[in-house]
């Protein structure tokens, strides 16, 4: 015979109403008691009736996460997977389910719209690439809880968003290289379209200026993502500035191709040119040489996004939240040229 709420309450030594409140998330219960109840539920193989919970609470106990269908690498991207893992962990801790959908029909976002209009979810997390004007209007017009993963191009009342502090990350990279004694740095960017790339450009420009260097536009090199494009872009920069001694790459693909190109040209790393890249992707520490990185904690990004969404669900009228999470430099051999020349 299946276990009941009374069985759970008896095992833990609390009232059935306390068990019910933990299951439904309707009251503040101490973490110790909450954990005991969850452990008992697991031990007795108790599964709450989701339909009954929904009827009692007026909640679906489900959070939506939209995936950028236009990004073919989304599910193979380690950073994306870590963010999703964090979001899922938070939703489970809250007793919710996570529903993942895509914006494959970008013309009208019909799948996402249906989730919102038919109240199939209690809140939604959107990547900035999916946060179209039309979809934002729909969410705001229906007073629907949502948060955008990434800084949007336009700031509007009611839009909550969370992102890494890409501008500060780029500033930190330039300042780190300056402390290490590097004098001439270029920034390799895949494009100037996305907000995070533009923020990294802004940070680079700000830090180069503060360090008393000439902030020439051609120190910012747009390189694309293909191997031959990146190699050609680096060669053009070296032809123009033979004294380049360091490169900041704005993502790991660019960094990998930069390593390949410099090795092919027999340019010593870090002996002649130091390299630092955004994103501490899994293989960065195993490259030859291991790459110094601007670490982007995407697990924390997903965790904060989910927790902020639950906060919004509980208090829909709260002031707009704009959250920037800090990056950090992880130093490895790609920027350590002999002895550290400056402390």
Predicted regions located by residue number:
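Amphipathic helical "hinge" segments at domain boundaries
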Residues: 46-110
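Short, well-structured alpha-helical segments in soluble
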Residues: 108-120, 230-243
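Flexible loop/turn connectors
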Residues: 235-343
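Flexible loop/hinge segments that line or gate small-molecule binding clefts
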Residues: 127-168, 253, 279-291
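Hinge/beta->alpha junction and helix N-cap segments in small-molecule ligand-binding domains
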Residues: 69-81, 100-107, 162-172, 188-233, ...
């Amino acid at each position: 015979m299946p276990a009941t709420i009374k069985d759970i309450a008896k095992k833990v030594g609390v009232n059935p109403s306390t068990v019910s409140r933990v299951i439904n998330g309707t009251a503040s219960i101490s973490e110790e008691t909450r954990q005991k109840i969850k452990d008992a539920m697991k031990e007795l193989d108790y599964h709450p009736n989701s339909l009954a919970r929904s009827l009692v609470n007026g909640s679906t106990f489900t959070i939506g996460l939209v995936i950028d269908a236009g990004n073919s690498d989304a599910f193979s991207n380690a950073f994306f997977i870590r963010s999703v893992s964090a979001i899922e962990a938070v939703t489970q801790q809250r007793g919710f389910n996570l529903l993942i959908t895509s914006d494959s029909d970008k013309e009208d976002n019909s799948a996402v719209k249906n989730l919102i209009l038919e109240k199939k979810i209690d809140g939604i997390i959107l990547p900035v690439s999916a946060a179209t004007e039309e979809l934002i209007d729909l969410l705001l017009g229906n007073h629907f809880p949502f948060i955008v993963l990434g800084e949007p191009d336009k700031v509007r009342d009611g839009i909550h968003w969370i992102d890494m502090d890409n501008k500060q990350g780029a500033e930190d990279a330039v300042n780190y290289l300056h402390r290490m004694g590097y004098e001439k740095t270029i920034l390799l960017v895949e494009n100037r379209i996305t907000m995070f790339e533009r923020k990294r450009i802004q940070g680079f420009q700000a830090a180069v200026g503060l360090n008393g260097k000439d902030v020439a536009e051609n120190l910012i090199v747009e390189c694309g993502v293909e191997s031959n494009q990146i190699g050609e872009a680096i060669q053009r920069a070296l032809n123009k500035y033979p004294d380049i001694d360091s490169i900041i790459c704005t993502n790991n693909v660019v960094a990998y191709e930069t390593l390949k190109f410099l090795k092919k040209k027999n340019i010593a790393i870090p002996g002649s040119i130091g390299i630092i890249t955004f994103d501490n992707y899994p293989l960065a520490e195993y490259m030859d040489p291991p790459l110094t990185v601007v670490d982007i904690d995407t697990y924390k990004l997903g965790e904060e996004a989910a927790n902020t969404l639950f906060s919004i669900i509980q208090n829909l009228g709260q002031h707009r939240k704009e959250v920037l999470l800090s990056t950090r430099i992880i130093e490895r051999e790609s920027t350590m040229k002999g002895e550290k020349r400056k402390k």
